[in-house]
């Protein structure tokens, strides 16, 4: 029987690259479903994370950073993910970094739907050197858009997250839960495993490696001893191969070790992970190649 007091709905978390959207999503859900690195545009897909409380179910849509400077098929695809998410949700959370406002932030404002509850989240408040700067910064942004609420947060320290959830809950429609109570994401574990490998790549060699790098799980075999995984790292140029390998293969060994540890923690079972590299020239600027590699 339906509970007339229960609320459930979709929540888009949007913002320019590197403002902390994925870190916030992971903190709200309480587990890692979106990968994080210093490299902008780490998130490329629309990822649903689910949090269920006593009276609400939040389905968070972690989106790529909205790209305003660079073209190309991948960036067009990521921007489509953002605009589609904004059209399909009940609440919009616009994340901006404390004390920093740029052209990329401003270009998102016209896309925020006026018919949805919109919440301004000022992230990374723990990094502000002078807290007195926060109020004038927020006042400036509130004058630019009619946000329904503003919540300063530190996702890494867990500050103000409960207040943010309460503000989001106020915009969710009444309805039954869409997922089972223990569901954390609608993405399959193979997808999360591939993303964890990509995260380790970006964290270790992201400054040297261009964006033309993705990961595809090509083998997944569960046995009594655990799971055997073969992951293919697809790059665009032969010159990217030595960057990934490192001297004596040390980069790849570290990537594989750290990814294996995270995947084993995710699955709660032993993992044997093999990673190899494949060159596919120009894949990130071809719509067909993007679809072949699992991009929306």
UniProtKB/Swiss-Prot annotation:
Annotated stretches, region: G4: 123-126
Annotated membrane topology: Peripheral membrane protein
PROSITE patterns: G_ERA
Keyword Cell inner membrane on entry: yes
Pfam families referenced in this protein's UniProt entry, alphabetically: KH_2, MMR_HSR1
Function: An essential GTPase that binds both GDP and GTP, with rapid nucleotide exchange. Plays a role in 16S rRNA processing and 30S ribosomal subunit biogenesis and possibly also in cell cycle regulation and energy metabolism.
Protein name according to UniProt: GTPase Era
Lineage: Bacteria, Pseudomonadati, Pseudomonadota, Betaproteobacteria, Burkholderiales
